[in-house]
Swiss-Prot record:
Recorded GO MF terms: GTP binding; GTPase activity; guanosine tetraphosphate binding; translation release factor activity, codon nonspecific; translation release factor activity, codon specific
Protein name: Peptide chain release factor 3
Keywords: Cytoplasm, GTP-binding, Nucleotide-binding, Protein biosynthesis
NCBIfam families reported in the protein's UniProt record: prfC, PRK00741.1, small_GTP
Residue positions binding GTP: 17-24, 85-89, 139-142
Lineage: Bacteria, Pseudomonadati, Pseudomonadota, Gammaproteobacteria, Pasteurellales
GO annotation, biological process: regulation of translational termination
Cellular localisation: Cytoplasm
The keyword Hydrolase is annotated on this UniProt entry: no
């Protein structure tokens, strides 16, 4: 198979949703269809049942939430699909945001009983930064749901994206009978209690087929025909150009738990979603068709293998082909590295990659030298842009139970901050260590990982910090004066960048007014 054929058959996507909309279940079922797992594990930790394949970190198993972004690759039809699993818990936004920089399309999962929820809105804002194409799955049809037309209206008005229904539900809850495919003129009939394996679904061809009335009952069949009249008049037709531009989303209905409808959106994904896209670097646009390898690191994961204290850097290949043993340049350090043992993933199971192509995600072993945002090339000096650090919204001071372990604590915190689990700030005027996060759960994760991985017991104390901003100034003299006068509110972050830590928002606003020449940033490029 030629290089361009290999690249064109790849689809790299992530699933975005509000917590508990059913994302982990959908991930399971997607892998089942891709033959990656033969029987889907029921997701919440119910002791004896199989754990979901993508939730492999210890704390995730205990809580039944996906904390870290796993990568899973599987074949489907003629495509090779890379699914990046993003943390579903409302606290884990920074990791999730960054993962969205490494995909070419997204599946938005909505709980049909609840509609559009707050976290979905935030994540959609991030996909807008790059106009990522979105597919939508209306989940939980086996429960009582809101009116489907109302759900489409809400997506359009709240998320500012047009909806084009591809399938339409017949009944819901205990009366859920299946879905009708608007473009194939076929009805797929649902049977309950078959969520763990792939079933042969009965198909009725034609909307006016008498078999349909017999299968779902005359009342529901009549209701379906009436609703479809309305849908065809009131909703958008699918338009591929608008989809690619991120302005229109194809909508599928189903139940992930009942394993129904998942294959419909997978068909849509492989048929319509873009193959690996070009990507902007600081000096030029890098096309996926280029044969020289380039890639960027969007995530670092500690200890995927508890037996070894290793860290793995996840790299999205933008162009070219990875081959075992090849030499690459790590642009930030200007040094050459030999990649002899890159990994491919099936969440938590690692296999050594012999080759990988643009669109794929590979894992690089990292002994502390790779950071988020690092670019690797075959010699060219370029840096991919758009991999952000977000200013934390929550802060705690961290204190050791055993003061003699200061060195291990610092090492652990720096490593965890490079990995993006948390941000660390060291005030200029004292020896405090302040930890910043986007969500409360990150604090728990850090303490539990410090204990299990670095053998350090730490506790948190409240600290008088409301927000943080990275500061820069083009004139060194003015920056020095600013530092001298505001020393008590300045800190260095994990990457030694100067940061203003404000006790209140009022303080921040006043400081910004007082120093118009100093720039205050909410995000920082890695």
């Amino acid at each position: 198979m030629s290089y361009s054929q290999q690249v064109n058959k790849r689809r790299t996507f992530a699933i975005i949703s509000h917590p508990d909309a059913g994302k982990t279940t959908i991930t399971e079922k997607v892998l089942l269809y891709g033959n990656a797992i033969q029987k889907a594990g029921s997701v919440k930790g119910k002791g004896s049942q199989a754990h979901a394949k993508s939730d492999w970190m210890e704390m995730e198993k205990q809580r039944g939430i996906s904390i870290t972004t796993s990568v899973m690759q599987f074949p489907y039809h003629d495509c090779l699909v890379n699914l990046l699993d993003t943390p579903g818990h409302e606290d884990f936004s920074e990791d999730t945001y960054r993962t969205l920089t490494a995909v070419d399309s997204c599946l938005m999962v909505i709980d049909s009983a609840k509609g559009v929820e707050e976290r979905t809105i935030k994540l959609m804002d991030v996909t807008r930064l790059r106009d990522t194409p979105i597919l939508t799955f209306m989940n939980k049809l086996d429960r009582d749901i809101r009116d489907p037309m109302e759900l489409l209206d809400e997506v359009e008005s709240v998320l500012k994206i047009r909806c084009a229904p591809i399938t339409w539900p017949i009944g819901c809850g205990k009366l859920f009978k299946g879905v009708y495919h608007l473009y194939k003129d076929e009805t797929y009939l649902y049977q309950s209690g078959q969520g763990h394996t792939i079933q042969d679904v009965r198909i009725v061809k034609g909307l006016n087929n008498a078999d349909l009335d017999r299968a779902v009952g005359e009342d529901l069949a009549r209701q379906l025909r009436d609703e479809l009249e309305l849908v065809k008049g009131a909703s958008n037709e699918f338009d591929h150009d608008l989809f690619i531009r991120g302005e229109l989303t194809p909508v599928f209905f189903g139940t992930a738990l009942g394993n129904f409808g998942v294959d419909h959106f997978l068909d849509g994904l492989t048929q319509w979603a873009p193959a690996p896209q070009a990507r902007q670097a600081d000096c030029r646009l890098v096309e996926s068709a280029e044969e020289k390898l380039t890639g960027f690191v969007f995530k670092i994961q500690a200890n995927m293998d508890p037996k070894h204290r290793d860290r793995v850097a996840f790299m999205r290949i933008v162009s070219g082909k990875y081959e075992k043993g090849m030499k690459l340049k790590q642009v930030r350090l200007g040094k050459e590295v030999v990649l002899s043992d890159a990994l491919t993933f099936m969440a938590g199971d690692r296999s050594h990659a012999e080759e990988a192509y643009a669109g794929d995600i590979i894992g690089l072993h990292n002994h502390g030298t790779i950071q988020i945002g690092d670019t690797f090339t075959q010699g060219e000096d370029l840096k991919f842009t758009g991999i952000p650090n977000f200013a934390p919204e929550l802060f705690r001071r961290i204190r050791l139970k055993d003061p003699l372990k200061q060195k291990q604590l610092l090492k652990g915190l720096v490593q965890l901050s490079e990995e993006g689990a948390v941000q660390v700030f060291r005030p200029l005027t004292n020896n405090d260590l302040i930890v910043g996060a986007v969500g409360v759960l990150q604090f728990d994760v850090v303490v539990s990982r410090l204990k299990s991985e670095y053998n350090v017991e730490a506790v948190y104390e409240t600290v008088n910090v409301a927000t943080a901003r990275w500061v820069e100034c083009s004139e060194a003299k003015k920056l020095e004066e600013f530092k001298r006068k505001n020393e008590q509110n300045l800190a260095l972050d994990g990457g030694d960048s100067l940061t203003y830590i404000a006790p209140t928002m009022v303080n921040l606003n006043l400081t910004q007014e007082r120093y118009p020449d100093i720039q205050f940033f909410k995000t920082r490029e890695h």
